[in-house]
Amino acid sequence: MSGHSKWATTKHKKAVIDARRGKNFAKLIKNIEVAARTGGGDPGGNPTLYDAIQKAKKNSVPNDNIERARKRGAGEEAGGADWQNITYEGYGPNGVAILVECLTDNKNRAAGEVRVAMTRNGGNMADPGSVAYLFTRKGVVTLDKNGLSEDDVLAAVLDAGAEDVNDLGDSFEIISEPTDLVAVRTALQDAGIEYDSAEASFQPSVSVPVDLDGARKVLKLVDALEDSDDVQDVYTNVDIPDDVAAQLDAD
């Protein structure tokens, strides 16, 4: 899940990845296949493919799985589905806005699974455009602090188009326009700074703070959505205050 809260974007995301390693592998593999099909099979000339491969490697996806996905997408090897990108919009508990990005070979199945997850967990589907306007597409690069200060990171990426550097506790998050994502990632590499992930993401323009009960309900809905094999990413505008995050940590 991606949202406004430090806790929601770090601890919860890692917990979901740990709990659903197999599903996550499949989703990362799909990203590689689609990136290779769209922009060609050479990571050197296809930044989206490069970043998809890097993300898969950092999540311990075996190299031969990565290479087979790249070959399928590039047409060098038979197989591969006709993946389609679809975005669904909805509202969760407490009026939290939700965007659900799917990558599927069956639109009807994807729509059905998203709808069921929403309705069973206090959410409801919304008309196209009625939620999307609350989010802006941005480039997001995350990296562990590893002794770096915010100024160290800013100095490396400011001239590359970085708009903001957010302190997430154990890590930094660099925000840019999606078109500057490759430049920001390259600037970090040139400065000898390792990063965790670099991808286009939806950032909320307005956030909705929730109490403990609201946070639990929203996260339960996000978990249900992410359980679907067709769902790649879930974005929300939930803001989980620090005191609520501390209570969630204690659960």
UniProtKB/Swiss-Prot annotation:
Keywords: Cytoplasm, DNA-binding, Transcription, Transcription regulation
InterPro entries attached to this UniProt entry: Integrase-like_N (IPR017856), TACO1_YebC-like_2nd/3rd_dom (IPR048300), TACO1_YebC_N (IPR049083), Transcrip_reg_TACO1-like (IPR002876), Transcrip_reg_TACO1-like_dom3 (IPR026564), YebC-like (IPR029072)
GO molecular function: DNA binding
KW Transcription regulation (keyword) present: yes
Main location: cytoplasm
The keyword Membrane is assigned to this record: no
Subcellular location: Cytoplasm
GO annotations of cellular component type: cytosol
Entry superkingdom: Bacteria
GO biological process, one term: regulation of DNA-templated transcription
Family per record: Belongs to the TACO1 family.
NCBIfam families found in the cross-reference section: PRK00110.1, PRK12378.1, YebC/PmpR family DNA-binding transcriptional regulator
Name recorded for this polypeptide: Probable transcriptional regulatory protein Mflv_3828
